[in-house]
Amino acid sequence: MSFYRGTASHPWHDLHPGNDAPNFVSCVIEIPRGSKVKYELDKDTGLCFVDRILYSSVVYPHNYGFVPKTLCEDGDPLDVLVLMQEPVVPMCFLRAKPIGVMQMLDQGERDDKLIAVHADDPEYKGFTDISQLPPHRLAEIKRFFEDYKKNEHKEVVVDDFLGAEEAKKVVKDSLNMYQEHYVPRKLRNVYE
């Protein structure tokens, strides 16, 4: 993290992705579980802004945010849905364990979602792979993402859920893409 006198820290660029990434990752939560408010990171300022209120009656089924110092094909940090018992406030950060990835297309563009469990939540920390979740939980997540933009006349297609090993590969790839895009060559870390 950078704490310069008079300079705010940027949650995407200044927070560490986790000492044990990709097995455990730091996550910044933008949207709490149960919210209809679509908060989003303003990439220029690092502040959280209200992007929109969801047009339908659905609410976010779990805490939703991103992994710091990651970059995906859509130009955003890696999205993460963190399963845990309680909602948390926007822009807090926590430690989570990736257990899967949901492959998704948002208006024809790849927009995969990392699925993780809070590392210290007694109800969820024992899960190591998405296949261990009850089928209803996966159906709930899939239905939310298929429906949450329908009333805006935007198409979202959920392709498939993949397990923990694929999730860790997605984390490594997004960490490396961030390094290639934002970090000078001689200062880069390579995640293998």
UniProtKB/Swiss-Prot annotation:
UniProt PTM: The N-terminus is blocked.
Catalytic reactions of this protein: diphosphate + H2O = 2 phosphate + H(+)
EC number: 3.6.1.1
InterPro entries linked: Pyrophosphatase, Pyrophosphatase_sf
EC top class, as a word: hydrolase
Recorded superkingdom: Eukaryota
Cofactor (UniProt): Mg(2+)
Gene Ontology CC entries for this record: mitochondrion
Pfam families: Pyrophosphatase
Residues annotated as binding Mg(2+) 1: 74, 79, 111
Magnesium keyword on record: yes
MF-aspect GO terms: inorganic diphosphate phosphatase activity; magnesium ion binding
List of residues binding substrate: 38, 52, 64, 148
Protein name: Soluble inorganic pyrophosphatase 2
Chief location category: mitochondrion
One annotated GO biological process: phosphate-containing compound metabolic process
Localization in the cell: Mitochondrion
Alphabetic keyword roster: Hydrolase, Magnesium, Metal-binding, Mitochondrion
Subunit structure: Monomer.
Residues involved in Mg(2+) 2 binding: 79
pH dependence: Optimum pH is 7.5.
UniProt family annotation: Belongs to the PPase family.
